[in-house]
Amino acid sequence: MKTGPLNESELEWLDDILTKYNTDHAILDVAELDGLLTAVLSSPQEIEPEQWLVAVWGGADYVPRWASEKEMTRFMNLAFQHMADTAERLNEFPEQFEPLFGLREVDGSELTIVEEWCFGYMRGVALSDWSTLPDSLKPALEAIALHGTEENFERVEKMSPEAFEESVDAIRLAALDLHAYWMAHPQEKAVQQPIKAEEKPGRNDPCPCGSGKKFKQCCLH
């Protein structure tokens, strides 16, 4: 697998694939994917690849039927390459970390769109237990949730341009603070209830991560 940041054409290809297989349950675009991956990398507990790969599509029932193994493999490779690059920036070069916000041209001006990234981040938050986040850092999570939850839509719409800009500027530092805290205070995974035999994927069943490979052969296990 290649390393380093994805180039523009690779990001556009990921965007095209997310659009191609989009449903009401899946993430919308590469900005939302970036937000999800940032939250996964900042999680209190380790999140397995098959968990977040399924979350990309909104659940196991919505994992795409890939047009070809080549298409599936390229999607996986680019997603993991982007994740590795983001992890390196968060861990080693936080000054280089920049959320992959969207851009939209309105009346000749280019506007920064943070909603998709924040929705992706909150989708990633939902994959683990953040309940032990200290009160001192709850404003950081709220800074992202402000733009990443439907319940805050009305609040955002009523903000002045100045307040909106301030809220956008707060997202990057909030993500860095949350990542730094959980890396310094990792949490143990909760003990899971035993899975019934009939509910557990068989060794020859398709892996739930969507790779298309058998569970016993999947490169993610």
From Swiss-Prot:
Recorded hits in SUPFAM superfamilies, A to Z, give: Sec-C motif, YgfB-like
UniProt cross-references to Pfam families, sorted A to Z: SEC-C, UPF0149
One GO molecular function term of this record is: iron ion binding
Q: Which InterPro entries match?
A: SEC_C_motif, YgfB-like, YgfB-like_sf
The organism's place on the tree of life at top rank = Bacteria
**What NCBIfam families does this protein's entry cite?**
PRK10396.1, ygfB_yecA
Q: What is this protein called?
A: Uncharacterized protein YecA
Q: What is the lineage of its organism?
A: Bacteria, Pseudomonadati, Pseudomonadota, Gammaproteobacteria, Enterobacterales
